[in-house]
Swiss-Prot record:
It comes from Neisseria meningitidis serogroup C / serotype 2a (strain ATCC 700532 / DSM 15464 / FAM18). One of its GO terms (biological process) is tRNA methylation. NCBIfam families: trmA_only (TIGR02143). GO terms for cellular component: cytosol. The gene is trmA. This is tRNA/tmRNA (uracil-C(5))-methyltransferase.
Amino acid sequence: MSDYTQQLQDKKDHLKTLFAGLDVPEWEVYESPDKHYRMRAEFRIWHEGGEMFYAMFEKGQKAGGASLIRCDRFEAASEAVNRLMPELIAVAAQSAELRNRWYAVEFLSTLSGEMLVTMIYHKRLDNEWMQAAQALQQQLDISVIGRSRGQKIVLKQDYVTETLKVGNRDFRYRQIEGSFTQPNAAVCQKMLEWACGAAEGLDGDLLELYCGNGNFTLPLSEKFERVLATEISKTSVSAAQWNIEANRIGNIKIARLSAEEFTEAYTGKREFKRLKDGGIALTDYAFSTIFVDPPRAGIDEETLKLVSQFDNIIYISCNPETLRTNLDTLAETHTVERAALFDQFPFTHHIESGVLLKKKILGKSKR
């Protein structure tokens, strides 16, 4: 058994143990490539004896020479990132403006090879730096952002445009520097396919909480009459709106509300001007399904009460422990019809998973 296969089996075994006692079907397992799967990567820039190189540090140890790991290549990162790494360091090394006090770098790439590089400094960035960075940007055919304390200099653009294939359709996504995106694009496509499969035949309208840049929203919109998606981050809402227009989708509306705020609006506890200004009347919707992709902390108690009211729940989780806690509550009203493990983060302990729940009929399981 290969190292990759073994670590994936270990994750599946962990889920089986964690969810023991709950009526969960066999876990569907979606593999990742074993290398070049990360579209994002971050490194410190280490300066030593006139040399400059990429570095990471041993987990749990203080950043410094004793815990230093030199990274001339990084197998987990996309091939585009690996190709660019030596070129970027070589070009930057030739310029004092680019080299001096360069502290860290962040790469954001796409499946097509588009590249955004954020160069982080411990100095004020001036016109001389901008001129040098523009020359580097042109030479390497990338987009560059310069960051320092209190400064963000965007030389061309602060985003990349990713294309993900779901079924027979390509979806374009604007992914903005510093905002959340799924780092493993290959597995992300599998997650989108799975979610669309879980939604097959559910019909009606869809409510989505924590929609981000519309990663799941866009393909799921093909499975429902209308979609109302909520997200609190202004940056993510802006990206989601661009993505909706770029993909010419006409049945999605975005509400800039947190999950907690939406719960208050849905239950009639509060009215929100943001909903009215967006032309959103909750009474117009006939929701059959709710889709949730919460942060690591899981779904809070009040929002969980809201979620439990829906006939169908599609729940994507980045933390199986909080998923288990939430399912202990949801299992009182729903049965788990499907369960999936997505290996979004190979060779780490992190597990991404998904479940489809359907409301029990007369207290009996549908399964």
